[in-house]
Amino acid sequence: FAFLLLVLCINAQATHLIGGNLGYEYIGTVIVGGVTKYRYKIILTTYTNCGPDANPAFQIEPEQGPLFAGIYEHDIAGLPLGGADKPLIDTVGLNRIDTTKITPELPSSCTVGARTCIFEAVYVGFINLDLNFTGYHVFYERCCRNGSIENLLTPGSEGLAFDAYIGPPLVGNSSPVFTDVPIPFLCVGDTTSILNTAVDPDGDNLVYSFVDPYAGYSGPGAPAPLPPDPTLGWPVPSVTWGGGYNALQPFGAAGYSFINGATGLTAYYSPLVGDYVVAVEITEYNASGNIVGITRRDL
């Protein structure tokens, strides 16, 4: 079999950041100036190519940071993906706390090339939120994607963005935690299963789905912008797919993709060698059936 690498690149120079996800952890209440606030840890995980085909090649380590995410107030209770533009209420700096060189699981049925040097970097920051009954969005973006991506129309000029929805603070929700490494290597002509396993610390019901990856508002002229201010334009722009590709058919009509909505188990088949973008979203429902969180990962 030939070799297929499923990747996403968001480095300012392109070609070295190949994936990631954005989440959060509820810490508890704190008193600030006599007012009760709700404290959260914001967690950004990135996966960086440190091989010879990266830019820069043979990267020593991912950037130190801080990276900056925006905190925006949601405007419609019960509709976390609806509403109008979201007002910026704060910016949080995310500092790198851990870097690990990882070895992703590689398929045994095809030859793997040079793209097996990968750094996992974890960035964290803390934010105190006011009580509201609509929730908040955490937003982070970067440009540009790898120009070799097959299933996007103009990948080299499109950015990548993450948006995580935090339910109303009284819920005290933490986002699901992915337990696998989202760097899937596939063999052309061979169907491969990827777990996308996540554990929810609150015991919420998780529903998995394929979605359009976010492109955001960054671009080649502004590859690492500060969070949009004064508002986050809503909805966040998605990528522009190439002809014949979409969220449900990321490998085209001749390919195959499947996701189990209850478990996150995915299966992929591609008839062609190339770099492809896939996004998986997790929606959290509490025991009352209310949406309390939305997160996603880009592969």
What is the predicted role of each segment?
Residues 7-9:
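N-terminal signal peptide c-region/cleavage motif recognized by signal peptidases
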Residues 12-299:
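Long, compositionally biased, intrinsically disordered segments
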Residues 1-2, 12:
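Cleavable N-terminal signal peptides
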Residues 2-3, 177:
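Generic detector of short alpha-helix boundary/capping microenvironments
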